[in-house]
Amino acid sequence: MHPQVASLFDNVYEDLAAATLEFIGTAFFLLFGLGGIQASTAEDTASGQPPASGIEHVLYISTCMGLSLVVSAWLFFRVTGGLFNPNISFALLLVGGLKPLRFVLFCIAQLTGAIAGAAIVRGLTSAPLSVNNVLQQGTSAAQGVFIEMFITAALVLSVLMLAAEKHEATPFAPVGIGLTLFACHLFAVYYTGAAMNSARAFGPAVISGFPEPQHWVYWVGPFLGSLLGAGFYATLKHYKYWHLNPDQATSDYRKSPSDPVALLKSTAETFINVGDEETRNGCASNEEGVRATGDEKSSNATSSRTNFSPV
């Protein structure tokens, strides 16, 4: 076997173990995220009350998915990275954060974990699954693709900048990533269901028999979003983005801004000193001008006497 090919399998047992835990983490994430959405729908149906308003429903779904990702990603962050998303895995592969074998194993684990999570939600609740990603009436397939592309790119960029990039805030990356998911849901959940994760759309679709005829939107859009997010990150790295705002991630208090009062006082003193210096320079220039004029007159008088000759 070629050495480069053999190197792909150097850590195969660790990759298999990580993929197994990624399967568990994905099922865990979607169990609580989708379970909360399913519970909301079941409560509206069982209570006989009018369904919650659109804004309440959007907020509830966004909160369920965002908090579920914060908790799940934080639990598995030190173990597998807490990806739970083949589109995130693909972006990490593109930027060198995942090796090819682990990428393939993670994608399999995430897709099967999504099926398992959706199956558990369906088995534990009495109502049919109401958590499938579907395009809202009036939303075209092209609009759905671009919405999914942009929100996936935002999620990818949050993972790359907060987790893949190492800095002092990296241990808290799951919070920022979860908030990004929450914000993206606020925008897109009405139009597309806000998948930004092909596994999240695939799992419930398998259990429900693929009720959305345009399910392909949730593969094409997130795939393009992975490319967009990874490309933007690569551009930032290539042009050394950290030079634009050096010491931003440091905790050294000496890098903090100086005392504003002292800075204001120093600036005022500088302006006063500059004004005094300009005044002194102006006076000196006037004195030199007066002396130069007097010397010129004396020189002219002397020249006149020297050049005078009687008739």
Curated annotation (Swiss-Prot):
Extracellular side: 38-56, 100, 165-168, 237-311
GO molecular function list: water channel activity
Residue spans crossing the bilayer: 17-37, 57-77, 79-99, 101-121, 144-164, 169-189, 216-236
GO cellular component term, pick one: plasma membrane
PANTHER family per record: AQUAPORIN TRANSPORTER, MIP17260P
Primary role: Water channel required to facilitate the transport of water across membranes. Also enables low but statistically significant ammonium permeability. May be involved in fungal nitrogen (ammonium) support of the plant host in symbiosis.
Protein name in the entry: Aquaporin Lacbi1:392091
Species of provenance: Laccaria bicolor (strain S238N-H82 / ATCC MYA-4686)
